């Protein structure tokens, strides 16, 4: 996608945004839109202090997108951003990818939600089984939360146990949520273990003998696993009669076509996938060994929209492009370029910060002594990057997409130099 695929609404404004010396915000904002949002009672997420604070709320109120194309998006005020949120990782090829769009449109023209299964359903199942280590069969759902929830319920059905131990974020369902509205009895059945700390997981099995149905975990959140750690956890689970479940909703098809399992040489009893699987379209997958997956009919697992052929078509097209264009390798290369550039920019600005994470999901960490200063530095940095046309969040690692270019990365690094300098002046 060319750099000018999205042009600012004002022809006089270039893709580069103003670069203030001492202010975090310089993007244009519509006062009329701001007044409308503040008065609105219809959209609960748009009101101050509610759900999307820190994610979509930028400059004091949400940014409403007008259009997204490739690695760029334009908001309703005409500001253009290089998008490092990318639908929180679901848009791996780039927004509005033409091959995915064509596949989806063709599927929609055949019918949106037929009562019977479209052949694309079978095609996609066979493709996922080809790609995912130890996956004998698969079922499809709509969200990552759905897939992980189904995996946990299946583990409980197979083992006859209720307790779960976990690492990472798995969605908002009762079994893994600690928010209000969840019964204390449900919360009591979940214990979390420290990442890369095998002894902590061993201690939980010792504390709850013959009670734990499964280990469910993200293979990594930011830092990679220590050598042998994932396989050691798998062996620990099996030794204690539990299943080993990997939540690959973020990692799957991103760090490699075989996901984290192929990347780190481990295989799970059950695996959940989503996000990058369909380039932003709503579909997820639960894959696993046949001896376990064969029990899935006992769960009463039904989803009205799971047959949607448009999502199946999107996933098939996405997986085709991921493999043909070797997209995971491209993500790793671009991410490594960004991370090394950010490290150099922080050094040149004299700011104690460094890049962290895997290249396909980069992030930065400030090294100030006090947590309050580290958190403030991260907010200031992301706000300063926003004002320079780069959409990042302080609350979640970032993502790379296939439509980003070396020039996009280099532009981001130049902006980061100014953002780090701003942070240094403010803290």
Regions found by a protein language model. Name each.
Residues 123-213, 234, 336-339:
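PLP-dependent aspartate aminotransferase-fold enzymes
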Residues 16-22, 80-158:
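Glycine-rich loop-to-alpha-helix module at the N-terminal edge of alpha/beta enzyme cores
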Residues 15-68:
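Active-site-adjacent loop/helix segments that line or gate small-molecule/cofactor pockets in enzymes
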Residues 4-13, 323-325, 384-427:
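PLP-dependent enzyme catalytic core of the Aspartate aminotransferase-like
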Residues 219-243:
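Active-site core of PLP-dependent enzymes with the aminotransferase class I/II
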Residues 22, 318-340, 371-375:
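Structural signature of PLP-dependent enzymes
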Residues 264-296, 307-314:
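Active-site PLP attachment segment
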Residues 63-65, 335-340, 348-382, 404:
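Conserved PLP-binding catalytic core of the aspartate aminotransferase-like
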């Amino acid at each position: 996608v060319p750099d000018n695929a999205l042009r600012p609404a004002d022809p006089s404004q270039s893709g580069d945004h103003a670069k203030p010396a001492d202010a975090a915000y310089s993007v244009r904002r519509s006062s009329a839109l701001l007044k409308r949002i503040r008065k609105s009672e219809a959209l609960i997420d748009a009101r101050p202090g509610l759900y999307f604070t820190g994610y979509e709320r930028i400059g004091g109120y949400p940014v409403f997108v007008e259009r997204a194309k490739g690695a760029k998006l334009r908001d309703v005020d005409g500001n253009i951003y290089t998008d490092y949120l990318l639908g929180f990782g679901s848009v791996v090829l780039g927004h509005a990818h033409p091959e995915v769009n064509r596949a989806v449109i063709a599927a929609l023209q055949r019918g949106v939600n037929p009562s019977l299964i479209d052949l694309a359903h079978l095609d996609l199942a066979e493709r996922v089984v080809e790609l995912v280590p130890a996956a004998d069969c698969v079922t499809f759902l709509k969200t990552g939360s759905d897939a992980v929830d189904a995996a946990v319920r299946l583990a409980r059905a197979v083992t006859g146990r209720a307790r779960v131990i976990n690492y990472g974020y798995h969605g908002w369902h009762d079994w893994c949520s600690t928010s209000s509205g969840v019964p204390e009895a449900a919360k009591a059945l979940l214990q979390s273990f420290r990442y890369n700390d095998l002894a902590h997981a061993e201690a939980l099995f010792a504390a709850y003998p013959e009670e734990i149905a499964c280990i469910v975990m993200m293979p990594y959140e930011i830092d990679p696993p220590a050598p042998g750690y994932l396989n050691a956890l798998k062996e620990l689970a099996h030794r204690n009669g539990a299943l080993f479940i990997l939540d690959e909703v973020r990692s799957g098809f991103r760090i490699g076509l075989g996901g984290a399992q192929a990347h780190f040489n481990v295989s799970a009893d059950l695996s959940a996938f989503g996000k990058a699987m369909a380039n932003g379209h709503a579909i997820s997958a639960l894959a696993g060994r046949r001896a376990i997956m064969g029990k899935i009919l006992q769960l009463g697992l039904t989803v009205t929209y799971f047959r949607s052929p448009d999502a199946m078509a999107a996933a098939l097209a996405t997986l085709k492009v991921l493999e043909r264009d070797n997209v995971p390798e491209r993500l790793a290369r671009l991410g490594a370029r960004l991370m090394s550039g950010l490290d150099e920019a922080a050094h040149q600005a004299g700011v104690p910060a460094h890049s962290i994470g895997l290249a396909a999901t980069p992030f930065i960490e400030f090294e100030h002594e006090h947590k309050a200063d580290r958190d403030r530095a991260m907010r200031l940095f992301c706000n300063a990057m926003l004002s320079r046309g780069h959409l990042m969040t302080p609350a979640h690692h970032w993502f790379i997409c296939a439509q980003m270019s070396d020039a996009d990365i280099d532009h981001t690094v130049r902006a980061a130099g100014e953002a780090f300098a701003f942070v240094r002046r403010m803290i």
